[in-house]
């Protein structure tokens, strides 16, 4: 909340010659007693292309300021023509009326100013060298541009409106970088945890697969052992059968299977019994 409010500004001498002083009747309201004076300042914008040509026409301190509505007449000197580029002397420019409290600007009023020659002949055929004595100004007082700023007053805490300090932006950037680094580290840790979590089941799965492969190999070995045992048993049975046949041949003096008509016959158990 602003303690001082600008109620109105009246341009007293308008239009006027370029060399005439500026006069403003300023009305404002003060809501609370102030410890410091108000500083009013008028600035003439000499060029729209560079701030180097700006001229501070005048500044005054007003105070002590009583509570209530106050009015005063502010008079400022005209700008120096030699400090203004010749190409922009007779043209449209801007003047700025501002007020500050304790070095802090809280209100600014801007006006457009049209500078032109005072005769039709000079306006239609301007001379190469500007004739300042024939230049008049016309302030567009009906269309001011008012800008207000929040500042610290006497009854407000400094913490609410901290002053600008050099290097604060750099510190904030450093803090942001640290936060980003912490976020990246956190993201890396989370990624590592996820990788660890994904490795866990895979590792178990690989272990299970390894055990299954070992079981399969063991089964294959067992099967091979069984096949070898079966082959050994068959070989033993074959050997026993050959021994039995040889014994029968020794007893009868002729082979067991007698050939009839050139065909071999296999004796049945009955035939074997009869022969004995």
Curated annotation (Swiss-Prot):
Q: Which residues form a coiled coil?
A: 202-243
Task: Tell me which SUPFAM superfamilies the record gives.
Answer: ASF1-like
Q: Which GO terms describe its cellular component?
A: chromatin; chromosome, telomeric region; cytosol; H3 histone acetyltransferase complex; nucleus
Q: Where is the composition biased (Acidic residues)?
A: 155-197, 211-254
Report whether Coiled coil shows up as a keyword of the record: yes
Location(s), subcellular: Nucleus
Keywords for this entry? Chaperone, Chromatin regulator, Coiled coil, Nucleus, Transcription, Transcription regulation
Compositionally biased intervals (Polar residues): 267-276
Ranges for the region named Disordered are 151-276
InterPro entries given for it? ASF1-like, ASF1-like_sf, Hist_deposition_Asf1
Complexes and interactors: Interacts with histone H3 and histone H4.
Q: What does this protein do?
A: Histone chaperone that facilitates histone deposition and histone exchange and removal during nucleosome assembly and disassembly.
Q: Which family does it belong to?
A: Belongs to the ASF1 family.
Q: What is this protein called?
A: Histone chaperone ASF1
């Amino acid at each position: 909340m602003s303690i001082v409010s600008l109620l109105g500004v009246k341009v007293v001498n308008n239009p006027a010659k370029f060399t005439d002083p500026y006069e403003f009747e300023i009305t404002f309201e003060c809501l609370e007693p102030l410890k410091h004076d108000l500083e009013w300042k008028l600035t003439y914008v000499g060029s729209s292309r560079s701030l180097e040509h700006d001229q501070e026409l005048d500044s005054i301190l007003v105070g002590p300021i009583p509570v209530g509505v106050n009015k005063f007449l502010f008079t400022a000197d005209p700008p120096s023509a030699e400090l203004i580029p010749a190409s922009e002397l007779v043209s449209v420019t801007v003047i700025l009326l501002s007020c500050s409290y304790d070095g802090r600007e809280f209100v600014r009023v801007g006006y457009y100013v049209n500078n032109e020659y005072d005769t039709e002949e000079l306006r239609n055929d301007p001379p190469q060298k500007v004739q300042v004595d024939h230049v008049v100004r016309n302030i567009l007082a009906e269309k001011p541009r008012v800008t207000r700023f929040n500042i610290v007053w006497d009854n407000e805490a400094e913490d609410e409106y901290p002053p600008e300090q050099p290097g604060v932006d750099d510190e904030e950037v450093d803090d942001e970088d640290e936060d980003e680094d912490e976020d990246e580290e956190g993201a890396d840790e989370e990624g590592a945890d996820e990788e660890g979590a994904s490795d866990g089941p895979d590792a178990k799965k690989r272990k299970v697969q390894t055990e299954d492969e070992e079981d399969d190999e063991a089964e294959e070995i067992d099967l091979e052992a069984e096949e070898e045992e079966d082959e050994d048993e068959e070989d033993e049975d074959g050997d026993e059968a050959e021994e039995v046949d040889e014994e029968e041949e020794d007893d009868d003096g002729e082979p067991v299977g007698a050939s009839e008509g050139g065909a071999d016959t296999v004796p049945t158990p009955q035939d074997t019994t009869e022969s004995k």
